[in-house]
A protein has these predicted regions:
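Short glycine/proline-centered loop/turn elements that form peptide/ligand docking sites
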Residues: 26-30, 46, 63
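Short, locally clustered residues in the helix-turn-helix/winged-helix DNA-binding domain
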Residues: 34, 38-42, 120
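Short alpha-helical segments that sit at the start of domains
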Residues: 4-36
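Short, amphipathic alpha-helical interaction segments positioned at domain boundaries
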Residues: 96-130
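Short, Lys/Arg-rich nucleic-acid/phosphate-binding segment
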Residues: 80-105
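Short acidic, hydrophobic short linear motifs in intrinsically disordered regions
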Residues: 45-54
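Short amphipathic alpha-helical interaction segments
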Residues: 56-72, 77-81
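Residue-level marker of regulatory loop/turn positions in helix-turn-helix DNA-binding domains and
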Residues: 28-29, 40, 97
Length: 130
């Protein structure tokens, strides 16, 4: 064992144990769902195409296996749907999307944001009990 003066504070040392404890306390989440929520945490909203390209997954697999299950369990929600009316004049004047090329925007719900915050807190605590 190294002396304490050589060991620095690194919250990622708790990553494996914190992940396992977090997933045990949240049975509706899997490790891949958690990683996707961590990826999406700082985004206001997103499209499936953008996430598939930047997350490195096939669009069909991402939507069927990850986005829609997280949507149905309440971790994500539809931020802008095709039927969502715009309320501002600027949106009506400068909108370059029509009903034929419109993509639904998704966002992380409060439940998803709180789950990610709890996970971050468990990484920082030495005794990661969630």
């Amino acid at each position: 064992m190294l002396p304490d003066k050589y060991v620095k504070s690194n919250y990622l040392k708790n990553l494996r144990s914190a992940t396992n404890e977090f997933l045990d306390s949240n049975p509706d989440l899997t490790k891949s769902y958690l990683y996707l929520l961590l990826f999406l945490y700082d985004l206001e909203f997103f499209t499936i195409s953008w996430v598939a390209e930047n997350y490195g997954m096939n669009k069909k697999n991402l939507s069927d296996r990850m986005i829609y299950p997280l949507l149905s369990s309440g971790y994500l929600y539809k931020h802008f749907d095709k039927l969502t009316p715009s309320q501002t004049l600027e949106d009506h004047l400068f909108r370059d999307e029509t009903k034929y090329n419109y993509r639904v925007r998704y966002a992380m719900s409060q439940k998803g944001r709180l789950a990610v915050q709890r996970f971050y807190a468990s990484l920082n605590s030495p005794d990661s009990s969630i």
